[in-house]
Amino acid sequence: MRTLIRFLILIALGLSAAGRAQSLPVTVMPVTARHGMVVAGHPQAAEAGRQVLQAGGNAIDAAIATSLALGVAEPYASGLGGKLMLLYYESATRRTYVIDAMDAAAGSLDVPAYVKRPAEQHAYGYGAVCVPGLAAGLWMAHGRWGSRPWAEDVQPAIALALAGFEVLPKSRDFFEEQAKKLRRGDAEIARLYLPQGRLPDAGTLLPNPDLAHTLTLLAQKGRDGFYRGPVAAAIAAAMKKGGGVVTADDLATYEARLTDPVGIAFRGDRIMSAPPPANGAAMFLAALKVLEDDSFDAGPLRSARNLDRLGRVWRLVEPQAYRLIADAPESRGYFEKMIAPDSIRALRAQAGALPVAMMQAPSPDQSALAATTHFIVVDGHGNIVCATQSLSVHFGAGVVPPGTGVVLNDSMSNFEFSDPKHLNYVAAGRRPRSTISPTIVFRQGQPVLALGIPGAARIPTSTLQVLLDHLVLGRPLAEAIGDTRFHFVIPWKPGEVETFEAEQSLPAAQAAGLRALGWKVVLPEAAGRGRLFSGVNAVEFNPDGTLTGYADPRRTNAAAGY
């Protein structure tokens, strides 16, 4: 199915594919189109969005179709039971908006009682579930900017849920990885995703009639089709039975937020990304400011010397962002202080002052592995949706309320539980932080690049390396995305060793050089597997008015345009 869809996209629609990037660990095949582009985490979702664009829908209409189809085709990564952070660039006004539809803790949460629960209950089962935000976020986007009837935008996801999505080989990897969770005890999730009690084979079509019914109610009644009525009642009943804390009132009163992005000036460009409670942008934007004047010896970025430079900076900005950026009114001010000239000069001096082993350890904190997906939609008017959506970890809390077909998030696990003074400490109605970082780059006021990536703590480091490779070292995006992916694991306890992680395509000489500089080097994954280092999705805006989509094959990503 995936091969067929890509063939139809490239051949039947008359698109051009740029040449392959040579001698790279991962080959990224750019797809260029003139009228519209969708890049998404599954080819059937990308195609759903493309069809909406070609039928006359705008970027928001196609984004709704793409988002909901992703929830069908990547049930381990995102969906109605999870969260959404959406950047929208409106070309007519040249303004960028953000819809924060992040999951929220229950409004009536008894914090002292919840904190005393076993840690496992913060991460699995109904007790781990926050109020989902995705449907409310899409509804808000449609109400402000959609051009077609809401029901028409939802219809492609309904059709996909009825017909079944194709389990691709890399999709099956995630099913296999989460087999224990799928078999753990929730009968509904096992029924849906372990047909006949077995992991689905690649090529299997997996329908979800219950989810199709939920989507039909959403199409008919708008946000109330999910947050009120029979779906909400089913969720609330399952929560009560399963020890959850989310009530029908919590669902009915949830609201997405319309807000503004955070951003920096960088070498004449303007880079905008996700605001608090997301903290990933604070990390890579601050790092970019520290490194703004660095030439990296004209490359390559992945030399031991340059990687050590990046790691020293990351060692400083990551703990700041975890400490200061959360769902708190003061976090925007903290971000502005992080990127203020005096702060950047101090960070630059500190990063170069000491061997990495002598740098002070940050305050203890934690960062979870996550299940996330990213998509980008650009329409013929130049409007852009750049959005990341997530269940927190793969298959979320591992539960599906009977009759709904909806996998619920485990976002309660993203809160801080040990320090009541921490900005991310669990609280009623608070939205837990996340590293998700949909990003748009502007040059002379015009968009030149939109990108995003799933991957939890690796989201901001991956975004940083792609931007540095492309914007500073001038590498084509296909090369920046296809080269060896890496990440810095910063210890949270004094005495722990700084760890540099990379795909196994990292040259041995550079690994040895990093070890000599004090880094522990771990190469956990072959290049292109995408389980840890995930896949970047991007759209480039070309001078001739065409759009080039980049779908990282580390995952099941696909680009579709016309």
Regions found by a protein language model. Name each.
Residues 6-16:
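Bacterial N-terminal signal peptides
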